[in-house]
Amino acid sequence: MIAFSTASSCAQGRGDSEAGDFLLQLIKINTSNPPGNETQAAQYIKSVLDKYGIPSEIFESAAGRGNIVARLKGSGKARPLLLMAHLDVVGVEREKWTVDPFVGVIKNGYLYGRGASDDKAMVAANLAVFLQLHRDRVPLDRDIIFLAEAGEEGTPKYGIEYMIENHWEKIDCEFALNEGGAIHIKDGAVNYVAIATTEKVPRGLIVTARGTSGHGSIPRPDNPIVHISEAVAKLGTWQTPMRLNDTTRVYFQKLAQIADPELKSLLENLNSSETQTVMRQKYWTEYSKLRTSIVPTIIKGGFRTNVIPGDAQATLDVRALPDENIPGLIEEMEKLVNDPAIEIKRTLGNERPASPPSRLDTALYRAMEATAKKMFPNAITMPDMLTGATDSSQLRAKGVQAYGISTPKTDEDSRRVHGNDERTSVEGLNTFTQYLHDVLIAVAAQNH
């Protein structure tokens, strides 16, 4: 059993139970990206909003790539808050699922389906809270804008980038509340709440080795396969320098308070080379939060056994710290490889912008922190830097203070995100809906 707090004003209405119904319907709409097909999901949301007389608009960036926006008006005393989540999902390997990923199956207290966690659970919770505030006629000091966007899974030009470039006036805001972060469950209870205030920046690099093509029976010193293999081995095992920022410094200090004895000892001695070696071997996520990471993901070269190719390539997934100097990083990589046959270039396209972390002293961060303490009194709350990427990065680049939080998850639940049998706890979704409701009341309602 997982113990959640249920003390929330939202629980007195229908918002929490509605979220599960909305999620079921959204899972049934296949928005795998590519191709996306988010307009169909946006039309479903519009039909729900229409029932309550809430005006909404769908903006298509391309055929079928819909983004939907709605607004609850406030007094204008404070600038708007953007309540956002993305409609698209990653694809599936159907044969590896034990349930149909696009039906929405509930068993043993979990709702299964693609997007059950990332990110249709947040779409559903946002919609439920948005409707609850409307039904309760909550007087607001700031507008609350609902956005469900396309293209987050690798094609933000169809979603958040399109909305910023073409319809910024529809989503212009002071704060954004998005996916990311964590409500982490251990031994049946929430032990920490991590609020995402920044994220690592994805950068793609292509490593190319060039040589002389020829017959495979004659070994050549400039064989591109050999050179690319040696370069990838060096880059893939390079321990880049450790560097803390304001977010990760607080994150690791607080994580040490609840960590097991081994991890606690490591976190208290981060500067030790022995610590970094152990973290690389056992604590991969924490290791990645400490540095810019370089991960080889694709190698291409050759087309038949008896032919030495003229070139070979490797793709590197670089997740850079927000303040990383990418040209300087490439120079360091070239020095490390030290091979004139190797060229390292940055790929362009679908990159997220680097931007400063969101502050820890804003009204929204304080509301998220206070609500977490109220609902999960035995848990610690801390800021977090995501190793992955979200649409918050584009908003932070516009000066928006954007924060991320996600539905409650165990480690097993987290492992299923983007994987097989993705799921979310029904009880956890209800609790998450209550959490969002109380955060919005604290930061947007009058007399709070």
Regions found by a protein language model. Give the residues of each.
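Second-shell loop/turn segments in exported
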Residues: 28-36, 111-116, 193, 214-219, ...
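N-terminal signal peptide c-region/cleavage motif recognized by signal peptidases
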Residues: 6-8
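N-terminal hydrophobic or amphipathic helices/low-complexity stretches enriched
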Residues: 10-36, 48-55, 93-96, 199-201
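Short amphipathic alpha-helices in soluble, non-transmembrane regions
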Residues: 222, 329-337
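A non-catalytic alpha/beta surface segment that caps or lines the substrate-entry region
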Residues: 32-79, 98-103
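Fold-level recognition of mixed alpha/beta catalytic cores in primary-metabolism enzymes, strongest
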Residues: 116-292, 421-432
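Active-site metal-coordination/substrate-binding segment of hydrolases
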Residues: 78-145
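An extended, acidic, His-containing surface patch that forms the Zn2+-binding/catalytic region
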Residues: 76-78, 184-186, 241-303, 310, ...
